[in-house]
């Protein structure tokens, strides 16, 4: 009987000590804020502001463009974006296809298009796909942690 009483008390204590974890994460709310960040990226990029684009990344961010090595950190990202802009890249547009994650990280899958201009004349159109890992650094403030993309254009032989 003593054992039954001890087991009953232990069970009551265990049940009483359990805390239910419920998440209040709202992917639609996150998407609203990430969409705003994407709009800023497009505005900065299309206006030649590599610093503005770099500021949309966390300090330790990595960027993985096609046909080149890994780019680490905001300063290196700023330089890479500046090089792209100097090469004539402009008119970038992002289209989000999917977004999923949690309160800490969200993965965005999408498509992009851009133009390459020389003396104001379009000399090439490019389009492709991307994946971005967004990190929530404070309430409703999402910055890029990792970014990888590639072009749909065939490699010239």
Predicted feature locations:
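Polar/charged side chains located within well-ordered beta-strands of beta-rich proteins
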Residues: 38, 57, 84, 108, ...
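Short beta-strand edge/turn micro-motifs at domain boundaries
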Residues: 127-153
């Amino acid at each position: 009987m003593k054992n039954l009483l001890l087991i009953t008390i232990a069970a009551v204590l265990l049940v009483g000590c359990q805390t239910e974890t419920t998440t209040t994460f709202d992917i639609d709310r996150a998407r609203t804020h990430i969409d705003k960040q994407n709009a800023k990226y497009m505005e900065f990029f299309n206006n030649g502001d590599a610093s503005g684009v770099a500021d949309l990344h966390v300090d330790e961010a990595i960027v993985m463009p096609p046909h080149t090595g890994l780019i680490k950190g905001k300063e290196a990202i700023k330089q890479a974006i500046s090089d792209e802009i100097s090469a004539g890249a402009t008119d970038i547009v992002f289209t989000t296809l999917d977004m999923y994650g949690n309160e800490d990280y969200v993965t965005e899958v999408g498509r992009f298009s851009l133009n390459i201009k020389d003396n104001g004349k379009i000399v090439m159109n490019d389009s492709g796909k991307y994946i971005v890992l967004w990190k929530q650094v404070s309430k409703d403030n999402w910055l890029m942690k990792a970014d990888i993309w590639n072009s749909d254009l065939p490699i010239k032989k």
